[in-house]
Design a protein with these regions (language model features):
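Noncatalytic alpha-helical scaffold of FAD-dependent oxidoreductases
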Residues: 1-419
Length: 419
């Protein structure tokens, strides 16, 4: 089925898609035919990006392809259609008694979209969601299908593909035996304590998030600990006090949408995200941006942002600071560097946010900040090229796999590939 009416906006209502057609294939052969006969095309995922990365003249939704989720216990993998969302994948994984190594803050996003943009959760030893990929199947611009597995040449360049290499139709991910997680929240962490004990705090659980508005006493620390590992003991956390009720990262909001806290153990999938699958995580009245910085620059980078606090706070809903382990994926924000992610959830005030993002990027320039591909940023293509040592290799890979430029939308030309 093909839709030709207005395609609407992203999840937050901050970007209106410009595509003229939306194709909804129900089988792979239709995907091949659409791609081979279209001049300019891209895949539309769960609409959780905050920029035009997933826009083009024509779009393809893979939601109507059979999910075909298959767990291979011997290989410790799960394979699935690229149209599957994490929330739906989780149901099968839990039924089969297996788990992923990590999840993003909300499970409502598509697996393929998260992988293509190197979306991440948190954890000193946990790579982003793309690091779980063991195999990809993809439709090239010629309409042909090819598959590539971990260890083969150029695999590391194809996983975080930004939609530039082809239409990923099937994904195989690493899994492990299911595990339980308990979550505790601490309030009132002071900046000096965070600065003095940053590594201790960010490694005191399997997954740790620090929520802040860049003031002195409004900081929350969310610690998600595997029950089969030893993490932070009872008591305070370098002066921060354990919460006695469930909290929302935005303290004024009800915690009903959030995953259970107070140390109550539960399945990995019910604790690693901040928001429950059966909830609406936000009103959508927001804009997001995020920058990933090598751990060695983290404290200086946070101080540079704090220096802008008076200008940031009027338009900020909340910031989140997380850790992500290094990987070998060419266009991952964590390529060859253990990273600290500084995330901003802004009020939906586009003009003010755009100006603030420029100021933040200027402040973070000395620290070689890499912007999150799916969020709002202004970093130009020349700067991007300098930030990624395999950038030239990626550009060559795009030219080889998509010689006619079918997947090179305006966003890719502007920020990644150049004109």
């Amino acid at each position: 089925m093909t839709e030709t009416h207005a395609l609407g906006s992203n999840w937050a209502g901050t970007y209106m898609y410009q595509a003229q057609k939306l194709h909804r294939p129900t089988k792979i052969e239709q995907v091949q035919e659409i791609v081979a006969n279209t001049t300019s095309v891209h895949v539309l995922g769960s609409r959780h990006s905050f920029n035009s990365i997933a826009d083009s003249v024509e779009l393809i939704s893979l939601e109507d392809l059979p999910a075909a989720v298959v767990v291979d216990h011997e290989a410790q993998t799960v394979s699935l259609s690229a149209g599957v969302k994490y929330g739906d994948l989780i149901k099968t994984l839990n039924h089969e008694g297996v788990a992923l190594h990590n999840l993003a803050s909300l499970p409502h996003i598509s697996v393929a979209g998260a992988i293509a943009t190197a979306t991440h959760g948190s954890g000193v030893t946990s790579g982003n969601l793309a690091t779980a990929v063991a195999k990809l199947e993809m439709v090239q611009s010629s309409g042909e299908i090819f598959a590539i597995s971990r260890g083969e040449p150029d695999f590391d360049g194809m996983v975080v593909g930004l939609g530039a290499l082809g239409v990923v139709t099937r994904i195989t991910l690493d899994v492990q035996p299911a595990y339980q997680v308990e979550q505790r929240v601490f309030r009132g962490l002071r900046w000096k304590a965070l600065s003095d004990h940053f590594d201790e705090i960010t490694s005191c659980g399997y997954s740790v998030s620090i929520f802040t508005r860049w003031g002195e006493m409004d900081n929350q620390v969310w610690i998600k600990s595997r029950t089969d590992e030893t993490d932070w003991a009872e008591g305070d956390l370098f002066g921060a006090v354990a919460a006695t009720v469930d909290l929302n990262p935005i303290i004024e909001r009800d915690a009903i949408a959030c995953t259970p806290q107070l140390g109550r153990p539960g399945l990995w999938s019910d604790r690693l995200p901040h928001f429950r699958m059966d909830s609406i995580p936000s009103s959508g009245q927001e804009i997001q941006s995020e920058y990933l910085i090598a751990r060695r620059y983290a404290l200086e980078a946070m101080e540079a942002v704090r220096a802008l606090a008076d200008e940031i706070q009027p338009i900020l809903q909340m910031s989140e600071i997380r850790r992500v382990a290094a990987d070998r994926l060419w266009m991952s924000m964590n390529y060859e560097q253990d990273s600290v992610a500084i995330h901003f959830t802004w009020k939906r005030e586009p003009e003010a946010v755009q100006k603030m993002v420029v100021q933040i990027e200027n402040a973070l320039t000395p620290f070689k900040a890499r912007p999150h591909w799916g969020k709002v940023f202004h970093t130009d293509v020349a700067t991007i090229a300098a930030l990624y040592t395999r950038h030239a290799d990626f550009v060559r890979l795009v030219g080889r796999l998509d010689p006619r430029g079918a997947f090179r939308n305006l966003w890719l030309r502007t920020y990644v590939l150049g004109s």
